[in-house]
A protein has these predicted regions:
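Solvent-exposed, low-complexity, repeat-rich "mucin-like" stalks and linkers
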Residues: 1-2, 61-100, 180-210
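Surface-exposed binding patches on compact interaction domains or structured appendages
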Residues: 1-23, 86-135, 201-218
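Tandem-repeat/low-complexity and Cys-motif detector
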Residues: 12-15, 29, 69-71, 122-128, ...
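A short beta-strand micro-motif common to beta-rich folds, especially ectodomain repeats
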Residues: 22-25, 33-45, 134-138, 146-160, ...
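Short beta-strands and strand-coil junctions in structured, solvent-facing domains, enriched
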Residues: 28-30, 88-89, 142-144, 203
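Solvent-exposed strand-loop boundary residues in beta-sheet-rich modules
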Residues: 45-47, 97, 160-162, 209
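Edge beta-strands of extracellular beta-sandwich domains
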Residues: 48-56, 163-171
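Extracellular interdomain linker/stem segments of modular secreted and single-pass surface proteins
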Residues: 56-63, 171-178
Length: 218
């Protein structure tokens, strides 16, 4: 006899003749609330019927998120995706102590296709009956003017305290060094003048030619 699927439950076989064991199995479930299906075993003809209730246990509350995300040296926007079955999600940031990436938590994120405030209750509680997708977008990230990767860690916390992290890394910028004067003319007394250096690297001054050129005045 062929199996039969009703709702989230599969019965194998879905029908029979006389005494027989029926295997009852269900789909994998990610909702936080136990679900129930009512079925009837009955004669193909006639009024003989027996009711059965199939309960499926709730899944544990959870939250998952992309473990890493990257931003180009030029800056811009990065989107981080995840899944959960929680009633609310709260986002926070921990910048790297040595080379921090400056980003701000947006006012809202997308949960099950709806704009949701950070830490706010998610509309219609989609996690009660299954997992849902969420995403958060960080925009207007400035260009990296340093020669180091910049890092910030995003933490998302579910209502039950479960957490997941994303390490956001911005690629190192290009090294540069500029000076505001290419020529300095000192007077005979050697009176000090200034060259201003604009750089994002460590630098030093070395002699560019093998010997000094002296002009002999006659």
């Amino acid at each position: 006899m062929a199996e039969m699927k009703i709702g989230f439950v599969t019965f194998n076989p879905g029908s029979g003749d006389g005494d027989q064991a029926v295997t009852v199995s269900g789909e994998k479930y990610k909702g936080r609330v136990r679900r129930t299906l009512q079925v009837e075993f009955g004669a193909e003809s006639g009024d003989v019927k027996k009711a059965a209730t199939i309960n499926q246990a709730a899944a544990a509350e959870f939250v998952k998120i992309d473990p890493t995300a990257s931003v180009g040296k030029e800056g811009g926007t990065v989107t981080i995706n995840g899944t959960s079955n929680s009633t609310k999600l709260t986002f926070s940031l921990t910048p790297d102590k040595t080379h921090p990436l400056t980003v701000e938590i947006p006012a809202s994120y997308q949960a099950a296709g709806k704009a949701t405030s950070n830490g706010g209750v998610i509309a219609d509680d989609p996690g009660a009956t299954g997992d849902f997708a969420f995403s958060i977008v960080f925009s207007d990230i400035a260009a990296n003017a340093t020669i180091n990767d910049l890092v910030n860690t995003l933490k998302v916390t579910a209502a039950g305290g479960q957490t997941a992290n994303t390490v956001i890394t911005q690629t190192a910028g290009d090294p540069f060094l500029e000076i505001d004067k290419a020529v300095i003319n000192l007077d005979a007394n050697g009176t000090p003048q200034t060259i201003n250096v604009n750089a994002n690297i460590r630098w030093t001054i070395t002699q560019a030619v093998s010997k000094l050129v002296r002009t002999i005045m006659k």
